[in-house]
Structure formats: C-alpha cells, structure tokens
UniProtKB/Swiss-Prot annotation:
Protein name, per record: Nicotinate-nucleotide--dimethylbenzimidazole phosphoribosyltransferase
Keywords: Cobalamin biosynthesis, Glycosyltransferase, Transferase
Catalytic activity annotation: 5,6-dimethylbenzimidazole + nicotinate beta-D-ribonucleotide = alpha-ribazole 5'-phosphate + nicotinate + H(+)
Family named by the database record: Belongs to the CobT family.
Keyword NADP listed: no
Metabolic or biological pathway: Nucleoside biosynthesis; alpha-ribazole biosynthesis; alpha-ribazole from 5,6-dimethylbenzimidazole: step 1/2
Length: 356
C-alpha cells in the first residue's frame, strides 16, 4: 500500500525540454510572439506536465466536490443551517447547483464526495466519510493527524484512479456550512497574517457578526498552535475534512502529472497546505478565478498566483474551476490548430513581441 511519503516522493518534476519545445512552437504560430499573453504561458505550463505526454491536451474533465460539516458552526460563524450541507449535496446529485450547471456547460463530470457530512448517507454521493462533521476548532483540533493522513491517501488514490480512466483535467470544489472559518484560519497560519486581514463574510454573514468570526479564528489558532511548517498539522488542527479532501486531489493529480484547476478562497487554503506538504505540487496548479472573499489576495500572493478570471464570485462548490475549463481547452486549441508563420512566408522583425 502506498504511503504518504511515497506519494510526495513520486510527484514528477515538469518536463523542461517539452516546455521549451512548446514555447518554440508557439512562437512560430501565426501571430506576433507573446501576443496571446497568458494563453501562451498556460499552454507551455501544460506541455511540461508528464501526464499530458509533452503536449497541451484535455481528455475527460472532472470536478471533485468535497462535502463536510464543521463543528465550528456552533460558534455562530455562519448564517445557513448546518443541514444545508446535506441538502445541497443531494441537489448536486440531481445536477441543479451552480457547479453542476457550469460543469455541464464545460463537458465535465461532477463527483460529489462525502468526507464528513453530519447527516445520513446520501444516495448518489461517493462515500469517503471520516466522521459526521469535524471537531470544533475553537475548542480543539478538527481531527486527528491519522484521520487527515488517511483521507489524503484515499482521495489521492481516487484521483489517480480517475486519471487511469481518462481524466486529464481536474477541478476542486467544496461544500460545507461554516467552512470559510477554518479556511481563514489556515490562510492566517500559512501566511502569518492576522485573522482580521483574512476573515470575510463567507455566505453573506452580517457585518455585525464578523468580529465574532475573527475572534473564533484567533482562538482556534491560539488553542491548537498549528505548525505552519507542517501542512498536515495545520489541516488536522484548524482545517476540516473538505479542506483535506481538496488537498488530496491536488496531491493525487500532481502524482499523475496532471493539472488541477483551483476554485476560490477555500481551495487557496488547501493549495497552501498542498504546497507546504509537497512543494512539487505547485507547477500542476492552475488558478481559475479571483475569489471575492476578503483573504483571497493574501493567499494568492503567498502562492504567487494570478487567476485567469475576475468575476466577483464567491459561491464555492468548484464553480470557478468549472468556469475556467474552457480557457484550458482554448490554450490547447491555440497550440494545435493555429497556422504557422513559416507556412505563410511571414518573417517578423526582431523585438516584435508587443505587436498587435
């Protein structure tokens, strides 16, 4: 049985030679070099991923939505009843939520995964439940380290199994009432920022209750003392099962040499954990959209990422990841379908990168 250590060790490095070949090919297409901007850099990033065999391409697409409840809901940090997690998970199996509609438009399959819903099992939902909700981080750890490690492995294996069945582009999402609170705690720990700088309104928390949410995050960090140099410690102490699950998707996809589209603020916190646990994950992550949640800019700056979309979205669920999938496909189409300068006898002068 694969261990976490083996998983981290076996993440391949990007193929620098394939990236150089891709850049050379792109520079020879029917356009001034660099004129398609980040679409070009995205194509080069994809070309370096070993799971894509040296060329930007997209096969099957999947959005993995990690669903779980949080004990910290008891601290009054969310406006929605806890049962909404289970209700929305059931709605996802019917294809009626935001991520389902956007994923269908992108031609992606949504995998609804129960990693800790506080309700009876839901038909049509993948069962990876660790417990019925995690612990209240305001009074103790979210889970044990062994629970976090086991879930990371289980989700990474599930991700790799999907890769073996033809999935080459993954998106991550989550569902869980009150989960922006542990996400803010994780971002605070990993970036060294005060809770006041990263705590936002989540799912429309009234401004009058923000100070309480800030206080809850500060208490969670003070009580649990998570080690920012140990990603699993942070996940287990102030995270949640859904955040662990998203981290597992990133680790699993990277192990298979395949890209992962991040979603919003929740996924940024998981990405911070994944990159701390295994820095080799970073080249496989693609930021989809700039979350409207308050701590987004700080988290993205720490990840050195600039999202492709600015849509003022903060739904979660993986909605931004699904929305950005056509951008990845556009980068592949550009790479494979554009004509070449040489075939049209066009010779561009030196230093023409900024021509229009």
């Amino acid at each position: 049985m694969q261990t976490l250590h083996a998983l981290f060790r076996d993440i391949p490095a990007p193929d620098a030679e394939a990236m150089a070949r891709a850049q050379q090919h792109i520079d020879g297409l029917l356009k001034p070099p660099g004129s398609l901007g980040r679409l070009e850099t995205l194509a080069v990033q994809l070309a370096g991923m070993p799971g894509l065999n040296g060329t930007p391409q997209v096969g099957e697409k999947a959005v993995l939505v990690m669903c779980a409840d949080h004990g910290v809901w008891d601290e009054g940090v969310a406006v929605s009843p806890k049962i909404v997690t289970a209700i929305q998970a059931a709605n996802m199996t019917q294809g009626t939520t935001g991520v389902c509609v956007l994923a269908a438009q992108a031609g992606a399959k949504v995998h609804v995964i129960d990693v800790g819903i506080d309700a009876e099992p839901i038909p049509g939902v993948v069962d990876m439940r660790v417990a019925r909700g995690c612990g209240n981080i305001a009074v103790g750890p979210a889970m044990s380290r062994s629970q976090a490690e086991a879930l990371l492995l289980e989700v990474s294996r599930y991700t790799c199994d999907l890769a073996k069945r033809g999935v080459t582009l993954f998106g991550v999402g989550e569902l869980g009432m009150a989960n922006t609170t542990p996400a803010a705690a994780m971002v605070s720990v990993f970036t060294g920022s005060d809770a006041k700088e990263v705590v936002g309104i989540g799912a429309n928390l009234p401004p009058s209750r923000i100070d309480n949410k800030v206080d809850v995050v500060r208490r969670a960090i003070a009580i649990n003392q998570p080690n920012p140099r140990d990603g699993i410690d942070v996940l287990s102490k102030v995270g949640g099962f859904d955040l662990v699950g998203m981290t597992g998707v990133m680790l699993g996809a990277a192990r298979c040499g395949l890209p992962v589209l991040l979603d919003g603020f929740l996924s940024y916190s998981a990405a911070l954990a994944a990159c701390q646990i295994a820095p080799a994950v970073r080249p496989y992550l693609i930021p989809s959209h700039f979350s409207a949640e308050k701590g987004a800019r700080i988290a993205l700056a720490h990840l050195s990422m600039e999202p492709y979309l600015h849509m003022a979205m903060r739904l979660g669920e993986g909605s931004g990841a699904a929305l950005a999938m056509p951008i990845v496909e556009a980068a592949c189409a550009m790479f494979h379908n554009m004509g070449e300068l040489a075939a049209s006898n066009i010779v561009l002068p030196e230093g023409n990168a900024n021509a229009t």
